[in-house]
Amino acid sequence: MKQTIVIVLLAAVAMMACLQMVAAEPLPEAAPAPSPLAEAEALASPIAEALANPEALASPEAGRILSFIKGLAEHLGKK
């Protein structure tokens, strides 16, 4: 009976030591979230490059992008 109690106590101590070691590990640091301005600039830079290049406006994709930009500008009131 005493032997069982000692084994259970040693197991509990070992389990607590393992939990303490796991809890002591630092959490991985998350990358800081980009600011809304930086995110908007990253999204707008390919569009600005396409609008600056007249040959790019001749592509079929440019028509969709241009119509999206015009619709967005109208929606925001920047006609």
From Swiss-Prot:
Molecular function per GO: toxin activity
Entry keyword annotation includes Endoplasmic reticulum: no
Main location: secreted
Positions of the pro-segment in this chain: 25-62
Signal peptide range in chain numbering: 1-24
Location(s), subcellular: Secreted; Target cell membrane
Domain of life per record: Eukaryota
Keywords, alphabetical: Amidation, Antibiotic, Antimicrobial, Cytolysis, Fungicide, Immunity, Innate immunity, Membrane, Repeat, Secreted, Signal, Target cell membrane, Target membrane, Toxin
Family, as annotated: Belongs to the MCD family. Mastoparan subfamily.
Function as written in the Swiss-Prot or TrEMBL entry: Antimicrobial peptide with strong activity against the fungi C.albicans (MIC=6 uM) and B.cinerea (MIC=10 uM), and weaker activity against the Gram-negative bacterium E.coli (MIC=97 uM) and Gram-positive bacterium S.aureus (MIC=97 uM). Shows cytolytic activity against insect cell lines. Has potent hemolytic activity against ovine erythrocytes (80% at 50 uM), but has no hemolytic activity against human erythrocytes. In vivo, peptide injection in the vicinity of the head and thorax of lepidopteran larvae induces feeding disorder that lasts one or two days before recovering.
Protein name, as recorded: Eumenine mastoparan-OD
Species whose genome carries this gene: Orancistrocerus drewseni
